[in-house]
Amino acid sequence: FHAAALSQLNYFWPTVAGDSAPTLVDNKVRLLAHASDTVGLRLDTAALRDVAAEIEWRKTTMRSIEQYAHAGRPPAARLPIDALVDLQRAYEKLKDERRALDFEDVLLACAGMLEAEKRVAAAVREQYRHFTVDEYQDVSPLQNRLLELWLGDRTDLCVVGDASQTVYSFAGADSRYLLDFQHTHPQARVVRLERNYRSSEPVVATANALMRGRAGALELKASPAVVRAIEPTDPGAVAGSGASAPATATVTAYPNDAAEAAGVARSIRAQLRAGAQPQDIAVLYRAHAQSLDFDSALAAEGVPTTVLGGKRFFDIPEVRQAVMALRGASVAPSQGDLVRDVRDVLRSLGMTDEPPTAGGALRDSWEARAAILRLAEDAASGTTLRTFTDELQARQRDHHEPTRRTVTLSTLHAAKGLEWVHVHMVGMTEGQLPISYASGPEQIDEERRLAYVGVTRARASLSLSFSRFGGRGPRDVSRFVQETGIRTIDADDAVAIRGGRPPRGR
């Protein structure tokens, strides 16, 4: 949406307004900091980010500042509503003075231009006839309005979505557009895609148990092809070992957070020893703060990790340094052996043949350089160092990153759209999932959908875990775990369920 709207604004603005299009705000938080100074507020970065999120919600739901003031939103950045409104007005004033637009303004301005300028709308509709919208459950009122303006009175529209994966309501997403699609487009053909080609039967059964009876929920069925590919002939077989991965869905209880992190790390180490590949394993959690214990526990087991949502691969200093060094080396005479040439350059930067035994920054650096070496090993025969570095720079421009052989740590939100053979969903307690501040029915439903997203990331095995005690006393297992019907195994008994699906029913 944003790319198309920005392109249309830049093209038509000079004709419509008689001057160049406004610039884009490159840092909303920084501009908000300047705005807060003008109204006498002193806010830290976290508070400014909260205010930025409120501005985004207001605009994507197509509300004016006055309407926002009466929308009944929960307090943001610990500010009273009057102060929040004043700050938003100051932010908009600063933008106007600088002739700048933020990302939400791009959609608003494009929609306004199409509504006001009939010739512009006609030109856009002449150029674009057919529209396909993916992840339609996550469109906002503003995006849907823009889509209507692009379409005009035509019906050449295909949308794809899953109401059970609506997890961005806090940012303005509204699944009603998907749920009501057949009503608003009575001539539409609806195809229910209920055959699941990713996950094993135990994973699919768990997902169905979570969402059964909810609005728009599908009753998924595991594809027989997936079942045949995943179900092992040897109960101990794991993906990557030359045999199939065990299809399991388990729930394990640990006495405390440290025990949970250590137990999950040991389980992952066992999967790796059995032949699983690190990049086929993920640890998913509700909040970023939960990653530290699991990252540390995995490091203690010697398991390399990547935290999803960190720096892009080509933004890592060691990678940037390696690309520059390879580029410099590419102008010198080559030995004709690409892998040897690349390895020599990486060794000159400090890469060793074997990875560091511990985790941390050194291991991260080694893994980043090792990923570049693997790209060289996978390059077509006859590839020169110059061609290889050209391809690296093209990847750098396009953010086309190589796969790193590491276990992934990720929030549930960041994991959406991805998949792994083995998924460990951790911290499955009341207060963590659902999160403590999810109080009303709509917020709890959003948390349920987030749990569903996590469950459906798993291809073969799904491990849910929780700790019975935390820093503030005993914890209750998540209602979502209880609804799956999977029997909870205490950590000491967990070995009893390896290689198969545990009994359902507690």
Regions found by a protein language model. Give the residues of each.
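Short alpha-helix plus adjacent loop in nuclease-associated cores
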Residues: 3-13, 165-169, 199, 307-330
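Conserved helicase C-terminal RecA-like lobe
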Residues: 73, 77, 291, 295-297, ...
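Conserved RecA-like ASCE P-loop NTPase motor core of nucleic-acid helicases/translocases
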Residues: 134, 160, 193-195, 250-256, ...
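Acidic, low-complexity intrinsically disordered tails
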Residues: 489-506
